[in-house]
Amino acid sequence: MKIAFLGTGLMGEPMAFRLLKANYNLYVFNRTISKTERLKKHQAKIFTAPEEAIKEPQLIITMLTDYNAIVEVLFRNKSNFKGKTLIQMSTIAPQESLLLKERIEQSGGEYIEAPVLGSTQQAESGELIVMVGCNSETFNRLKKILKNFGNSVIHVGDVGKASALKLALNQLIPSLLSAFATSLAYVINKGIDINIFMEILRKSALYAPTFDKKLPNMLKRDFDKANFPLKHMLKDINLIYQEFQNNNVNTQLVECVRNILINSVEANLSDKDYSALYNIIHPEK
């Protein structure tokens, strides 16, 4: 089976490799061509124009930065989607997903959303959580392909529902870490043994695994290996902030986290791992 895969960044590349491992014929496009080199060495077909990459395959998967990038790549040359299925896997707003559905269907194609939750390591090992928005018939037909990315493939509901759920979950990522970073900064400033702090935290209902995962980065202030770049986290929080405003959800907590991320970007931490927000919460003396 031929699959077009558009977007081979931090998450897209390991996800594309999962499809190659499953012996699918992969037709790849990325706006930065150098990010396709490893896939090319493993027999993926590389294209310099998205319309060429999607010409033959009946199934198209996008893992691009945001809605604007998706629109630019898919529609810049009036590509024909007749008889094709598009699986959109990026984190975008529900309304943006519905707009894509409308445009793809107007062109004779089929659209589903399938955002994922997990790290680059989980993308490599095929342990992502895949949230799917489409009708039941389409979900059952495409579930086998989506299981290449993770065994947990969940039908959330119609298009828009999975995108909304992804935003709800992504809101927790910087919120949890900001709270942890704040407590960690206070513990350090008070001269309390960090090992004691972590020992008690791990034994409590307050603990989240991400605390231990990001603790070494924070203590060393080493954020160069970006599992999730801070600029992308801010992109998601901006979407979440807008969605909460539009859906009668108090935004005070999100505003605080958003301000921390904005300050992080202004401190030239955009391309660092999002745990670099620690530098804003606990500035170096």
Where are these predicted regions, by residue range?
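Rossmann-fold dinucleotide-binding core
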Residues: 92-171
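Hydrophobic residues within alpha-helices
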Residues: 15-16, 35, 100, 145, ...
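Hydrophobic beta-strand scaffold residues
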Residues: 26, 46, 111-112, 153, ...
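Rossmann-like NAD(P)(H) cofactor-binding subdomain of soluble oxidoreductases
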Residues: 48-55, 59-61, 66-128
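Helical "substrate-binding/catalytic lid" subdomain
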Residues: 161-284
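NAD(P)+-binding Rossmann beta1-loop-alpha1 motif at the extreme N-terminus of oxidoreductases
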Residues: 1-63, 82-85, 120
